[in-house]
């Protein structure tokens, strides 16, 4: 947030099983978004539906206003026949408050109270101590979820990103839930050949009626563990034998700690200023002296604390691995917004001055696909971003992109900004119906996404070069659209044009955009060869 000015065949012929089918008509894949394994469920009804595409003029003139739960299942071990389920730590965790419990990977727990959702009261069987633990850091002992190779609700594209990370050898693998077949799993393996180079193959793991598992019916196993052991010893028709388990990065906790939503200002330490805009400064900092966070400090008068707190209650329920997580707030002026820290900063700066300058088209399209995945989630939740552009996308290690500042723009009370004119308002990213009449919907976000695509392929160039805001508004109303950027494939520019349709309802959905971009180099540009720039 901020102003523009400032900122399966059998035997040896097994084939890889794609989780998403390619549609006959378009060649694009429509799959569910990857979502974190243990995020809690929040009903759509708790989030207002801002997407009234047929808003009247009066409604439109209001300015900038106006999860899948994955329960712990599997084979459970009880303690001494008492019916007490034991859980096992999947990661190390260092206590952040006096009520938290520090623990190490592999440590066993008795869960005393799991009714709190994201933070459970537990007793360590190692130390005997009790305290709160993050529920997404543990799994039932001996369950599939406790296996290092099990990645839960990881999407196909995210599995490929994980496996193709630098340093992973051929045969690196993981198992995840199937996106298309309920109760089935997918085995994803890193492979290599002369034609494709490094790539990933996916195999569907099906369940037998008697509870067993198989990839091919001639090789059946009682457990997934036995299946993994078998294919680790020999490929037996797979592209390669299983060699190394993919690295499963430690996830973000859901919130900073139990009941740590409104935090004291003195619990936050501002360490390094990362950037500033017309309405806020962004700092890297720590909470409670032990947890790295990003802190947005809003300038006085930017928005009312009451309006912000009301919107923040909605924002904190939006949880997806392509959205920057809102951790906590300081609700008294000056308002502080505490979020997860992303090491590479904003996508805009990353593209202009950072590692992004050297990226080729496959990386850039993948980053766009990640943004589309996050926006597809926002779309499903009937929410709107209102200020989608590269400055509001944050980049982490491994070129992971997450959407920030969703929903905040409508709360800004600055007169120049709310009048949708002047240097503070992002005219060049805003759909004409939103800029002229205040009709902000998910379809105006789609328009903005088309502009963001130009930022990606031009490495952060300001849209509509050589034109001021007034000229942009006038020319766009007359039908002008930006030409195809240098070295950008025609097919990608056609997608931008599709996002910039005058009629909002003719613009694509983010679900469509995600599928198109995720399969871009197989369905649309299979003959792509890298050039000097892209």
Curated annotation (Swiss-Prot):
Q: Which residues does the record list as Phosphotyrosine (modified residue)?
A: 417, 528
In its keyword annotation, does this UniProt entry include tRNA processing? no
Activity modulation comment: Inhibited by phosphorylation of Tyr-528 by leukocyte common antigen and activated by dephosphorylation of this site.
Identify the stretch annotated as signal peptide in this record: none
Pfam family for this entry, one: SH3_1
Residue ranges of domain SH3 in the record = 82-143
Record's superkingdom?
Answer: Eukaryota
List localization entries.
Cytoplasm; Nucleus; Cell membrane; Perikaryon
Domain SH2 as annotated: residue spans: 149-246
Q: Where is the Protein kinase domain?
A: 268-521
Catalysed reaction, written as an equation: L-tyrosyl-[protein] + ATP = O-phospho-L-tyrosyl-[protein] + ADP + H(+)
Tell me its cofactors.
Mn(2+)
What does UniProt list as catalytic? Answer: 387 (proton acceptor)
- Keywords of this entry: ATP-binding, Cell membrane, Cytoplasm, Developmental protein, Kinase, Lipoprotein, Manganese, Membrane, Metal-binding, Myristate, Nucleotide-binding, Nucleus, Palmitate, Phosphoprotein, Proto-oncogene, SH2 domain, SH3 domain, Transferase, Tyrosine-protein kinase
What SMART domains does this protein map onto? SH2, SH3, TyrKc
Q: Which family does it belong to?
A: Belongs to the protein kinase superfamily. Tyr protein kinase family. SRC subfamily.
Q: What does this protein do?
A: Tyrosine-protein kinase implicated in the control of cell growth. Plays a role in the regulation of intracellular calcium levels. Required in brain development and mature brain function with important roles in the regulation of axon growth, axon guidance, and neurite extension. Role in CNTN1-mediated signaling.
Protein's recorded name: Tyrosine-protein kinase Fyn
Species assigned in the record: Gallus gallus (Chicken)
Q: Give the taxonomic lineage as stored in the record.
A: Eukaryota, Metazoa, Chordata, Craniata, Vertebrata
